[in-house]
Amino acid sequence: MNTMYVMMAQILRSHLIKATVIPNRVKMLPYFGIIRNRMMSTHKSKKKIREYYRLLNVEEGCSADEVRESFHKLAKQYHPDSGSNTADSATFIRIEKAYRKVLSHVIEQTNASQSKGEEEEDVEKFKYKTPQHRHYLSFEGIGFGTPTQREKHYRQFRADRAAEQVMEYQKQKLQSQYFPDSVIVKNIRQSKQQKITQAIERLVEDLIQESMAKGDFDNLSGKGKPLKKFSDCSYIDPMTHNLNRILIDNGYQPEWILKQKEISDTIEQLREAILVSRKKLGNPMTPTEKKQWNHVCEQFQENIRKLNKRINDFNLIVPILTRQKVHFDAQKEIVRAQKIYETLIKTKEVTDRNPNNLDQGEGEKTPEIKKGFLNWMNLWKFIKIRSF
């Protein structure tokens, strides 16, 4: 009876083992199938992506701008409404699909690389770093490597330092033994230099006292008044005031003053040059002279443009807003030169109509000469007013 129970127990045990083990194996088969299907789908998707890249004529790893540019070129060729000989709606649909897939793939790769780079930066950021100023606290920070090696280097360093100190001591001892007067000579030189300096100061003081006794300082302007060391403005630093005074006394000027003078001289030269160019041409001008005049005006406009750039630089450095300058208008300057030329022509015509009459004697002027002189004076005043 016991034998039968034992056999039944063994049979039941075998059935239970099979019931627990075999289904797990059976369950594992679909899992391997899923992995295989996923690997195949991943392979197929990579193959499709490569096909999309090939269809768009771009390489893997390209940027989104390159993908868009390639799509625009292909769309111009295959779009049904493009009117080209290669227009094909089916091809364009495939190209558009490839464009969307490739663009999304490129964006995903870019985002993945950026996130990976940010993670690496965060890791590097929060990673513990030993401060650069922290050295080994033992052995005076001498040496490198293991503690034993650092100790060995430190011993060598101490031996070298001791040898140098001994050499320096022996050197000083020999110097004091064979050159006992060297320190005395050095002290004598310093004392002589000090005596010479004091002698010069005493000489200058004696000369000043002698001049005061003679009365050379009696009639000086500002006698009995406090020295005016600084300017009236209390906000200026005394050091700045002294530096400015030294620069002014030595002929130096601030940069903005030099630029202001340069701008004034340049515009005066340009006005004079265009007026001289207009005088060389006839009145009225021939077609050839008109071409020459147009060329002169173009060159004048270019010079005015360069001058306006210098005015911009001047306005940036000038310390006072009221000192800033406005741009010069080339057309207004050309019209001004024309008016001055016309005034000169009219003045010349008046002078030619009323020739000088010098028969009345020396030092006597006719009304015509006075009138011509007044016209020239008015013209000169007009030129000066227009230039400022």
From Swiss-Prot:
Protein name per its UniProtKB record: DnaJ homolog subfamily C member 28
Chain coiled-coil ranges: 261-349
InterPro entries attached to this UniProt entry: DnaJ_C_subfamily_28, DnaJ_domain, DnaJ_homolog_subfam-C_membr-28, J_dom_sf
Record bears the keyword Nucleus: no
Tissue: Expressed in the fetal and adult brain, testis, uterus, spleen and liver.
Record's function text: May have a role in protein folding or as a chaperone.
CDD domains per UniProt: DnaJ (cd06257)
Record keywords: Chaperone, Coiled coil, Phosphoprotein
PROSITE patterns xref list: DNAJ_2 (PS50076)
Lineage: superkingdom: Eukaryota
UniProt keyword Coiled coil, yes or no: yes
Pfam families assigned to the protein according to its UniProt record, in alphabetical order: DJC28_CD, DnaJ
Positions carrying Phosphothreonine: 347
PANTHER family referenced in this protein's UniProt entry, alphabetically: DNAJ HOMOLOG SUBFAMILY C MEMBER 28, OS08G0560600 PROTEIN
Domain J: 51-115
